[in-house]
């Protein structure tokens, strides 16, 4: 990688996605503009920057872009840069006062601020109202920023964004360090302890190596434990067991190249930030990050408290029976036995879980339950789902207002160990659909947000993929044995003789004795090319018979001959053949990305 340098002044931001920014700078001498990208792009105007980075060329246009590695403010001895630097947060000195300082000391102003700030007090602040207080605040912030400038220049070279550096700097006072530089020098793995800062442990190791920090230090091992547990949580695990091939000790040993004894020694100190629980049944220990333990235990406690409350029945059994007779007659339907059982369960229990596979009638049951709640006067209901798509399907299926959990309680779960919600829930019944996609953290926030609610109805398919976040909440609630569960097991959506659902259930049970007929077939081919040709030809036949919107092709991959890219290209050539080697075909969706 060849490092190049530019001098430039920020002009405008043209794109951002999270920390990543694309901005336009211009050379103050030639006025030539150039593009800068990165996670630490400075955006203060009228300040001259010394920019270091890698120059890359965009393949299609040949346009060159500077991928920023580091920068520093230069020419602070020039009036405009000096005034703007003092006006930037967190110093925030009035521009008129900054201009006055520069007029008095000219190019010596920086040296005076660093080495003889008393002159600044005597000439600027002494005569001002509350001058002593304003001076102490200003000069204190100046000194902190000068120290931070050196530390920032050091850290950005390791790929740590300015945004993360600001978070680290805010955490310094909490950890009782004098400044960020002192914190990093004392413990390079301090970075791993700060909420919302996601840095790979290898980066901390590089910094530690530069500072000659010992490889087997307790702080490094604690950081390694945290790193391993965070990765485990991204894979859905709330905790790891201490011992075993997949245990925490083994994972930390592999990640850090340390011994089991060294990891065990740190664990025996019961380090801050971790919760260790003895699992007598497995003769092992569960190791949690403290905030993950709070979610799990807190959620269990909330549910226990809710189950312990005395809740009046919506209707007694006779009233439910009468309601079901009227409801089925009015709507011209017949509810299956388990669907009726779900209605009875909701009438009697504070929390009910309704589960079942695709096509078993969960939505039909939910509509009957909502009608029963309306008939009993419990019509102030809150309908939620885990995702936007799920809430939209809920609206279409019930004809009622529904929204996502996040939007309902206005929760912020951006940082892994910090969370908040702004809105409480008050309703007669809370109905949560697609609950299998709700992780432990969001479920905990949801139950914390409940102010008043007579009933909770949880709907979901336990066989679906679990949530992206940590925890398998729906499955755990069902297996707890403390909550009323109704499992719908009669397929309503498919024909009785269709093997599709039956074979899907066999797959879930890891069985392979599938039932084949015209609705479920296995076609054997000699190679991928033959398979792709068969798929495309069959697709063309079916679309002519049923229409394009009625036929779908699913492929487990993007690339290769039977991947989605190749299959889509083959189908496009069949449906809309190119007449003149045209790039676009009839029906293609086009978006204009540049105005010229």
Predicted features along the sequence, with ranges:
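Conserved pre-motif I regulatory segment
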Residues: 320-350
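Short helix-coil junctions and helix-kink-helix linkers
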Residues: 213, 231-234, 244-258, 329-331
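Conserved helicase motor core of P-loop NTPases
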Residues: 462-596
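Positively charged, polyanion-binding regions of nucleic-acid-associated proteins
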Residues: 218-241
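ASCE P-loop NTPase helicase motor core
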Residues: 239, 340-343, 347-517
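Long, highly charged, low-complexity intrinsically disordered interaction regions
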Residues: 16-220
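Structural detector for short beta-strands of small beta-barrel domains
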Residues: 1-17, 53
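Interdomain "pre-motor" coupling segment immediately N-terminal to P-loop NTPase/helicase cores
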Residues: 248-319
């Amino acid at each position: 990688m060849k490092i190049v340098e530019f001098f430039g002044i920020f002009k405008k931001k043209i794109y951002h996605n999270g920390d990543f920014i694309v901005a336009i700078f211009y050379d103050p001498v030639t006025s030539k503009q150039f593009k800068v990208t990165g996670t630490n792009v400075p955006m203060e105007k009228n300040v001259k920057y010394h920019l270091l980075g890698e120059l890359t060329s965009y393949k299609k246009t040949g346009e060159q872009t500077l991928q920023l590695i580091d920068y520093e403010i230069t020419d602070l001895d020039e009036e405009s840069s000096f005034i703007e630097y003092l006006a930037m947060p967190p110093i925030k000195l009035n521009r008129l006062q900054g201009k006055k300082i520069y007029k008095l000391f000219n190019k010596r102003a920086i040296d005076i601020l660093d080495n003889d700030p008393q002159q600044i007090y005597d000439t600027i602040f002494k005569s001002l109202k509350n001058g002593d207080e304003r001076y102490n605040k200003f000069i204190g912030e100046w000194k902190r920023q000068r120290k931070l400038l050196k530390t920032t220049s050091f850290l950005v070279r390791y790929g740590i964004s300015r945004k993360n550096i600001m978070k680290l700097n805010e955490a310094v006072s909490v950890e009782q360090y004098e400044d960020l530089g002192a914190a990093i020098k004392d413990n390079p793995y301090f970075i791993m302890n700060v909420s919302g800062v996601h840095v790979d442990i290898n980066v901390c190791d590089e910094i530690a190596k530069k500072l000659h920090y010992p490889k087997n230090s307790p702080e490094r091992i604690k950081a390694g434990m945290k790193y391993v547990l965070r990765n485990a949580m991204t894979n859905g695990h709330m905790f790891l067991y201490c011992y075993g091939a997949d245990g925490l000790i083994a994972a930390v040993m592999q990640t850090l190249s340390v011994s089991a004894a060294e990891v065990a020694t740190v664990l025996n100190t019961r380090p801050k930030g971790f919760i260790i629980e003895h699992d007598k049944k497995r003769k092992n220990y569960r190791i949690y990050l403290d905030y993950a333990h709070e979610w799990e235990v807190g959620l269990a406690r909330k549910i226990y408290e809710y189950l312990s409350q005395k809740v009046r029945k919506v209707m007694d059994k006779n009233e439910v029976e009468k309601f079901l007779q009227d409801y089925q007659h009015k709507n011209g339907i017949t509810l299956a036995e388990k669907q009726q059982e779900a209605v009875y369960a909701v009438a009697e229990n504070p929390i009910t879980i309704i589960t079942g596979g695709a096509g078993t009638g969960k939505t039909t049951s939910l509509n009957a339950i909502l009608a029963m709640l309306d008939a009993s006067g419990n019509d102030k209901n809150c309908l939620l789902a885990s995702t936007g798509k799920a809430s939209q399907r809920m609206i279409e299926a019930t004809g009622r207002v529904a929204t996502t959990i996040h939007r309902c309680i206005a929760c912020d779960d951006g940082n892994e160990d910090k969370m908040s919600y702004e809105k409480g829930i008050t309703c007669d019944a809370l109905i949560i659909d697609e609950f299998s996609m709700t992780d432990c953290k969001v479920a905990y926030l949801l139950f914390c947000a409940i102010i008043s609610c007579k009933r909770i109805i949880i709907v979901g398919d336990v066989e679906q993929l679990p949530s992206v976040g940590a925890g398998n909440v729906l499955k755990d609630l069902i297996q707890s044995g403390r909550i009323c569960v109704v499992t719908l097991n009669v397929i309503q959506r498919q024909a009785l003789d269709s093997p599709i659902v039956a074979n899907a259930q066999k797959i879930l049970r890891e069985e392979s004795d599938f039932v084949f007929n015209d609705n479920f077939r296995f076609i054997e081919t000699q190679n991928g090319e033959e398979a792709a040709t068969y798929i495309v030809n069959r697709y063309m036949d079916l679309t002519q018979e049923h229409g394009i919107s009625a036929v779908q092709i699913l492929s487990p991959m993007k690339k290769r001959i039977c991947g989605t890219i190749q299959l889509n290209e083959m189908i496009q050539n069949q449906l809309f053949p190119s007449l003149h080697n045209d790039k676009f075909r009839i029906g293609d969706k086009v978006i204009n990305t540049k105005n010229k």
